[in-house]
């Protein structure tokens, strides 16, 4: 298996002429990592004051994650249930930023996206802990947010750290796994969209990045 940082470094000085960069420091995938989340955060330089963001279902799925955060002063923002991320959710997360050094978002897209945009707007370190393989955007630089009854995709930030506990991911409901499969299949359409945009608007295009996506 190719080391993540080796893979990123191999895209330096690309023939397409674009600078390919990735702000992710660490990706940890393995069984039982829910009990190691705190140590992973410390290893990657997260400060002692932490916001834990989740909803009741995702926090239950990640049972044991709070116990792993020994040594952190933890504030909690727990939605009863969050299906669609709104700008109000972004602003709720931002309301903690005078009291925390980083954010641990536990869940998938609807939990991650408001944290992703809030952290981007305030340059706050972010760790995403995945509780289901329901989408393919864990490393995304954008966040779809409902604002004024319109869903808008905002430029955001990728997380500094991504953690996936394979036991938790395997135990996710079948419909969430199916949603993730659908997201992966849609990448083929997205690559065609990218080529069309390159032809019609001159958007930059890199065949090496496209090929990496196809292989994934």
What residues fall within each predicted segment?
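Generic recognition of cysteine residues
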Residues: 14-16, 22, 115, 119, ...
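ATP/NTP phosphate-donor binding region
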Residues: 1-102, 160, 172, 178-182, ...
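Short, charged low-complexity intrinsically disordered segments located at boundaries
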Residues: 67-72, 210-216
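A short, small-residue-rich loop immediately preceding and capping a beta-strand
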Residues: 97-132
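A glycine/threonine-rich phosphate-anchoring loop and its flanking beta-alpha core
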Residues: 122-215
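Short beta-strand/turn micro-motifs composed of small residues
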Residues: 53-54, 107, 164
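Short glycine-/acidic-enriched loop or helix-start segments at secondary-structure transitions
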Residues: 62-64, 114-116, 138-139, 173-174
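Short, electropositive, low-hydrophobicity segments enriched in small/polar residues
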Residues: 34, 111-113, 134, 141
């Amino acid at each position: 298996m190719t080391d993540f940082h080796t893979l990123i470094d191999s895209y330096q000085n690309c023939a397409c002429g674009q600078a390919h960069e990735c702000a992710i420091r660490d990706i940890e995938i393995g069984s039982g990592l829910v009990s190691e989340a705190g140590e992973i955060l410390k290893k990657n330089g997260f400060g002692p004051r932490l916001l834990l963001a989740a909803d009741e279902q995702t926090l239950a799925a990640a049972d044991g994650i709070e116990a792993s955060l020994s040594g952190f002063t933890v504030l909690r923002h727990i939605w009863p249930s969050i299906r669609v991320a709104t700008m109000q959710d972004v602003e709720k997360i931002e309301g903690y930023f005078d009291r925390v050094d980083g954010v641990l978002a536990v869940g998938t897209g609807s939990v991650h996206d408001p944290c992703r945009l809030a952290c981007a707007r305030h340059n706050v370190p972010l760790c995403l802990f995945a509780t289901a393989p329901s989408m393919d955007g864990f490393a995304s630089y954008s966040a779809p947010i409902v604002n004024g009854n319109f869903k808008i995709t905002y430029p955001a930030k990728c997380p500094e750290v991504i953690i996936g506990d394979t036991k938790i991911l395997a135990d996710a409901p079948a419909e969430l796994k199916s949603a993730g499969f659908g997201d992966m299949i849609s990448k083929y359409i997205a690559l065609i969209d990218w080529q069309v945009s390159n032809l019609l608007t001159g958007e930059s295009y890199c065949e090496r990045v496209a090929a990496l996506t196809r292989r994934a």
